[in-house]
């Protein structure tokens, strides 16, 4: 978002970046989280697991769009970031709720803490590697790689559904 167009970025000023990431993005993330929590509360995690997994992956295409068209309109950039963050917030609720549901029982607080640590690690490790990868391949190729790596989310969703069904069968 900050890199200049000559480097494949959008060239946002610090003020524009603050507005897009710090205000619009946070609002989208919060809205997505609220909608995700309400969805699970009313329909259960099994019903919403696939839509939430897809909401984590499909909005990544907004960054691919931005890398191809390099819009200079702050409204378009803000809208793309907002949509991606709503999807992320909505989908991330499934991640949190799955861990909470999976660790019930004896020593559940210790297991929940460990689960949250792995959750943080699953975010930090790719984030640490992403800057290096983006510099090596450029923004467009990087976002194509991000979309292709979404297959891992689909595989994790399948495994989560299998785990939930197995846990229900034991009850």
Language-model regions, residue ranges each:
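Short amphipathic helix-loop junctions that connect adjacent transmembrane helices
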Residues: 1-17
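Helix-to-loop junctions at the C-terminal end of transmembrane segments
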Residues: 31-48, 134-135
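A late C-terminal transmembrane helix in Major Facilitator Superfamily
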Residues: 102, 106-136
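Hydrophobic/small/kink-forming positions within alpha-helical transmembrane segments
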Residues: 30-31, 61, 124-125
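C-terminal transmembrane helical hairpin of 12-TM major facilitator-type secondary transporters
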Residues: 47-95
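Helix-terminus/helix-capping segments at the ends of transmembrane helices and short amphipathic helices
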Residues: 2, 96-104
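Multi-pass alpha-helical transporter architecture, strongest
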Residues: 142-171
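Transmembrane alpha-helical cores of Major Facilitator Superfamily
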Residues: 19-27, 54, 82, 113-121, ...
